[in-house]
Amino acid sequence: MSETAFERGNRLAAANQHEQAIAAFSECLRRNAQDWQALFNRGTAQMRLKHYPLALEDYLAAAALNPSSSNIKCNLAVLLKELGELALAENLLLEVLQAEPEHVDAWSNLGVVLQYALRYDDAVICHQNALQLAGASAGRLNNLGNALTCALRLDEAVNAYQQGMALQADDAFLGFNLSVALLLQGRYREAWPLYEQRWGTIMQPRYRERPWQGQDLGQQRLLIWAEQGLGDTLQMVRFLPELQRRHPEARLILACQHACLRLFAQLPNIELVPLEDTPPPHDWQLPLMSLPLRLDVTLATLSDQPYLQADPALASAWDARLPARQRGRLRIGIVWETGSWGVGIADHGRQNKSVPLTEFMPLLEDMDADFVSLQLGELPATLQDKVFAPEIGDFADTAAIISQLDLVISVDTSVVHLAGALGKPVWVLMRAESAPFFMAQGETSPWYASMHIWRQANPGDWPPLIASVAKTLRQLPRD
């Protein structure tokens, strides 16, 4: 019997050949435009390719033809989540669960939606319900571990991830997520090997050939390349001097973002190249964030002392451009939001890290201070008469400006790592679930002696924290 177009579409979709699957399902729909299953399956293939508007069109059409289908509603909810429509997704999944209280996928998807909505304990309950109904699986335990990690219920999170790995030891998502929970606990020696599993998740290594495993380099050439964010680059270059100490004859090449090149020129005996350029010949390569593993970094061996300096001439030039120093007033650098990460749920992390400007504003009111914006982009109109916005070219400029300030107050972004690396007092406005290298609790950082961490008491609730910061700021001595 010959294969039907619908069967061919399903086979191709199962093989992750989604473009071809879409063509097959479209063939079905040319024959019967009312085929809700073909619409549903084509929508799913469109979603796999992140063709979200087309997926939405297909799912809505399928739902109109079969309004009682829980599977259509579940997938539509997942799509709405990807579009950032969390309330709509939640309501749709609750509708499914009201009709089918034992719908496992609805419980799992609701848990993910509630996690993005910052309702971490509620998300945990959803994932526990899914596990109770369907039993343990790597995916369900990973979901549970993620919600527990966000809730900072870290011992429980570690247990969930470890249970998942007992079922599927090669699951990179479980291994990497376990490393994050361990990092939050300061269990670095256990975390670093698992952190290497990031390359089996959505992250893709820039280079794969000849990875350095920590062996003696002699006079060989090692390419170290930046990965992930600018803050990660600024944080991890601290380990290059120790690498040089252990391999004094090796030639070290650092491929980093353009914004870091001028600042990193101060690193002795390091050849710098732009990250996007073809690297010079090398014998081995290593992603920058694998250095802690190769150097066996623990809390006991981690130094919190400054390791970068601002260029004196550049600092002097910027000092002349900043608001003139006045007795009794502080110069304070501020960052209230990070740059856009994308659209829909892709921007969730940025939104969660950032303080809405209306909630940040009380920090600027009635304060004997001159505020300097350290974030890129045009200054909002509401800040024009409150904040000085220098035209910053790169991190050499930012470092020079920071060196002329009394304090930096910033959300979790690259600026806090730069301020800490310079030894400048920096107050970090930290979201409730924290971040891997900021520990789960405490006001100090093992990475930066000059850092004070202000932590949200409840997810998404910035006003009480901003009020506390403002109160403390007013009490600081002014010379």
Give residue ranges: language-model regions:
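Alpha-helical solenoid repeat scaffolds of the TPR/TPR-like class and their adjacent stem/linker regions
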Residues: M1-L407, D412-D479
